[in-house]
């Protein structure tokens, strides 16, 4: 079985918080789709809390769209990684990592400004599969940590695994 792209990078060298361009591909019609690794935690050293990650999932995509979508960029999806060290973001277009980092920072500030758990989008039994598994406080702790540490840019060449 061929390795997925995410398993071709050395996770022991991965900084966080950091942005990494994971993949660019073309659609049959020629549009570029970019996939970004938005790494919140250093792999195998730290993870995001379950409830905080779930709440971020509800907030992060909307806030990132507010700051990143344009005539040349449209976010398709932002989904948490199973390892709970970050999110993958797929989008149409090819923005640079610096613009992603700037939007991510602004989105984290937006998370901190959410006043109450009742303001979390789609937090109900009809639109969320585990609506009891949320914590705005934990999401805010994750956001504050990102802002405190600052977001760096990952160079894929520095992370490439040999023989992968």
UniProtKB/Swiss-Prot annotation:
InterPro entries: LuxS_sf, Metalloenz_LuxS/M16, S-ribosylhomocysteinase. Binds 1 Fe cation per subunit. Gene3D superfamilies: S-ribosylhomocysteinase (LuxS). It catalyses: S-(5-deoxy-D-ribos-5-yl)-L-homocysteine = (S)-4,5-dihydroxypentane-2,3-dione + L-homocysteine. Its cofactor is Fe cation. Its EC number is 4.4.1.21. Fe cation binds at residues 54, 58, 128. Pfam families: LuxS. The keyword RNA-binding does not apply. GO terms for biological process: quorum sensing. Belongs to the LuxS family. Homodimer. NCBIfam families: PRK02260.1-2 (NF002602). Involved in the synthesis of autoinducer 2 (AI-2) which is secreted by bacteria and is used to communicate both the cell density and the metabolic potential of the environment. The regulation of gene expression in response to changes in cell density is called quorum sensing. Catalyzes the transformation of S-ribosylhomocysteine (RHC) to homocysteine (HC) and 4,5-dihydroxy-2,3-pentadione (DPD). HAMAP family: LuxS. This is S-ribosylhomocysteine lyase. It comes from Campylobacter jejuni subsp. jejuni serotype O:2 (strain ATCC 700819 / NCTC 11168).
């Amino acid at each position: 079985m061929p390795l997925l792209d995410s398993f071709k990078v050395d996770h022991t060298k991965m900084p966080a918080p950091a942005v990494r361009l994971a993949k660019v591909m073309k659609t049959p019609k020629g549009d570029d789709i970019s996939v970004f690794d938005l790494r919140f935690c250093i792999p195998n050293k730290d993870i995001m809390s379950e409830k905080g990650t779930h709440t971020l999932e509800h907030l992060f995509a909307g806030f990132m769209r507010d700051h990143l979508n344009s005539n040349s960029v449209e976010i398709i999806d932002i989904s948490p990684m199973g390892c709970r060290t970050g999110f993958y973001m797929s989008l149409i277009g090819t923005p640079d990592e610096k613009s992603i980092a700037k939007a991510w920072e602004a989105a984290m500030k937006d998370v901190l400004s959410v006043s109450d758990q009742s303001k979390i989008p789609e937090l109900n039994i009809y639109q969320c599969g585990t609506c009891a598994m949320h914590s705005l406080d934990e999401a805010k702790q994750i956001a504050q940590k990102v802002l405190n540490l600052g977001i760096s840019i990952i160079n894929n060449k520095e992370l490439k695994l040999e023989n992968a």
